[in-house]
Regions:
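Active-site metal-binding motif and surrounding structural segment of the metallo-beta-lactamase
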Residues: 41-94
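Metallo-beta-lactamase
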Residues: 89-154, 251, 259, 263
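Active-site-proximal loop/helix segment associated with metal-binding centers of metalloenzymes
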Residues: 16-18, 129-199
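Cap/insert and terminal regions of metallo-dependent hydrolase folds
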Residues: 175-266, 271
Length: 275
């Protein structure tokens, strides 16, 4: 059986200081997909600490253009361009995203990187615009992008599928919209934001910020008939208790497996028959 690993490079919300911003890798059959890159060059440290060399990354997916998701991608691209010029990065970095996020990314790169680097956009770094429902291949994964129908910022989640039937769905970092049900229902793995505990909703005001709680995510997972729930994009005021308290709140509403990973924690993505 092919080993598949989800590694959370960061698990925090936009202004977290105790965690890095939410971003992760999916490694499968020798191929690595980087999903978002956080808000700065800490992404380089996180990749290094997770044992992911930059020259192993040839695919990146960006959900949206908020600073805590896209600015780290500038650093990834800059380093790939530099390594390519030095002859230590082979091949191409393929970056997938919707029109808005790719436009923002390219503009920042062309405004802030030297011409010797930005000139490599279109050769060493290829930007691939995806629309709602488009699919593309990353190694042995088929990735389908979908619009999460955010009312705040255009954002795409995705559904990854393997030939053995394993499915992993990323809902982005905003509350679930019923329009995305065809992509999320019956997934083996569901990645959902949980800004805080429902018990702490008065303290953190998640709903006013277009976010949800651990209890909300768990109820959603149960209603969508998923098997495994991964919570991320959280507040950072409870690092010593987060795993236990978020897991307990989610478990009270969802009978499947609940994961509340720390930064740099890896989770093995098993196929349905190995759950």
């Amino acid at each position: 059986m092919t080993k598949r690993t989800l590694t959370m490079l960061g698990t925090g919300y936009a202004t977290a200081t105790r965690y890095y911003n939410t971003c992760f890798t999916i490694k499968s059959d020798g191929t690595t997909l980087l999903v978002d890159a956080g808000g700065g060059n800490t992404i380089l440290n996180r990749l290094e600490e997770s044992g992911t060399p930059l020259d192993d990354i040839h695919y990146m997916y960006l959900t949206h253009a908020h600073t805590d998701h896209v600015l780290g991608a500038v650093w990834v691209m800059r380093m790939v361009m530099q390594m390519s010029r030095n002859g230590v990065y082979g091949g191409v970095l393929h970056v997938y995203g919707h029109d808005k996020v790719l436009s923002v990314l390219e503009w920042i790169c062309r405004q802030t990187l030297s011409t010797k680097f930005s000139a490599l956009i279109g050769s060493v770094v290829m930007l691939h615009e995806v629309e709602d429902g488009d699919s593309f291949s990353v190694g042995d994964m088929t990735v389908t992008a979908f619009d999460i129908h955010s009312t705040r910022e255009k954002q795409f989640g995705f559904r990854a599928r393997w030939s053995d039937g394993t499915t992993l769905v990323c809902l982005g970092d905003e509350p679930y919209n019923e329009a995305t049900k065809p992509y999320a229902e019956n997934a083996q793995w569901l990645l959902s934001e949980a800004f805080c505990l429902y018990a702490d909703r008065e303290k953190f005001k998640p709903y006013e910020k277009h976010h949800s709680t651990a209890r909300d995510a768990a109820r959603l997972a149960a209603s969508l008939n998923v098997q495994n729930l991964v919570l991320y994009h959280t507040e950072d005021k409870s690092p010593d208790t987060r795993k236990a308290t978020y897991t307990a709140e989610a478990k009270s509403e969802f009978s499947g497996n609940v994961f509340v990973p720390d930064d740099l924690e890896s989770i093995e993505i098993n196929s349905p028959k190995h759950q």
